């Protein structure tokens, strides 16, 4: 049985309030933690951009997609893979099917499992740019600095 994702949110607003589902107001940072039983995903929305960190197990992928849609996501500027284990990457194939993804940030940890190889094929088929995360790397996510 799939559980609908529960969500806790941290929002830093420059004015106004979120007022429920949909994209965050202009000029705000929204960080949503997507809890789907084992593992978490994190959605970061800022400056009109959306980034997803981890997408949990394969069977939870549809719940992640539903959650992203409920937050007004129609494309992802980037996804981040914190490690290549199935409980961090399994749901990304559903995400690739549902949304265009511009950049995929991978940890660079070696892995040759079927799940990881399937994920890499999905990245290739998506046509996304791939970047390997490294210590001290700085990224601009919609005007918000993300660093490793």
Predicted features, each with a name:
Residues 4-148:
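Non-globular, low-confidence helical/coil segments that flank catalytic cores
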């Amino acid at each position: 049985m799939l559980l609908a994702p529960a969500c806790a949110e941290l929002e830093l607003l420059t004015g106004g309030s979120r007022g429920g589902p949909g994209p965050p107001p202009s000029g705000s940072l929204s960080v949503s933690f997507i809890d789907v039983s084992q593992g978490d995903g994190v959605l970061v929305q800022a400056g009109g951009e959306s980034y997803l960190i981890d997408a949990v197990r394969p069977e939870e992928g549809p719940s992640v997609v539903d959650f992203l849609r409920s937050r007004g996501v129609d494309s992802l500027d980037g996804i981040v893979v914190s490690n290549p284990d199935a409980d961090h990457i399994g749901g990304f194939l559903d995400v690739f099917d549902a949304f265009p993804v511009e950049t995929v940030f991978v940890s660079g940890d070696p892995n040759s499992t079927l799940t990881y190889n399937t994920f890499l094929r999905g990245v290739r088929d998506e046509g996304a740019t791939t970047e390997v995360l490294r210590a001290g790397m700085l990224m601009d996510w919609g005007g918000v600095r993300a660093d490793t």
